[in-house]
From Swiss-Prot:
Belongs to the bacterial ribosomal protein bL20 family. GO terms for cellular component: ribonucleoprotein complex; ribosome. This is Large ribosomal subunit protein bL20. It comes from Rickettsia canadensis (strain McKiel). GO terms for biological process: ribosomal large subunit assembly; translation. HAMAP family: Ribosomal_bL20. InterPro entries: Ribosomal_bL20 (IPR005813), RIBOSOMAL_L20_CS (IPR049946), Ribosomal_protein_bL20_C (IPR035566). Pfam families: Ribosomal_L20. SUPFAM superfamilies: Ribosomal protein L20 (SSF74731). The keyword rRNA-binding applies.
Length: 117
């Protein structure tokens, strides 16, 4: 029986890793040993930052809402508390979008919330 060296399998694996490492600096885009370490680390960063992105966007929405609410004489925490009392159930993403793109609609929401202070 002849010896099977799995040449095609390892070549395809190398090709896959080097394709993922395309655009990396130095030997990281051409040398398999270096590329596999860099690709593995890049995938770890990608996994971590998919979670961090959710935190970052929530913080951005809060900053935008806070800036818009302060022009109406409230602060963020008061505004969110009065929204809950008023029974207005709009999430932060939509509120931030309204604050940036539809200031009239946001102003009407703030006035409804102010009625429940």
């Amino acid at each position: 029986m002849t010896r099977a060296k799995s040449g095609k399998i390892s070549k395809n694996r190398h090709k896959k890793i080097l394709k993922l490492a395309k655009g990396y600096r130095g030997r990281a885009n051409s040398c398999f040993r270096v590329a596999i370490a860099k690709v593995e680390k890049a995938l770890q960063y990608a996994y971590r930052d998919r979670r961090n992105r959710k935190r970052n966007f929530r913080g951005l929405w809060i900053q935008r809402i806070n800036a818009a609410v302060r022009t109406h004489g409230l602060i963020y925490s008061q505004f969110m508390g009065t929204l809950k009392k008023a029974g207005i159930d709009i999430d932060r993403k939509v509120l931030a979008e309204l604050a940036v793109n539809n200031s009239d609609g946001f102003a009407s929401i703030v006035e409804k919330a102010k009625a429940h202070i």
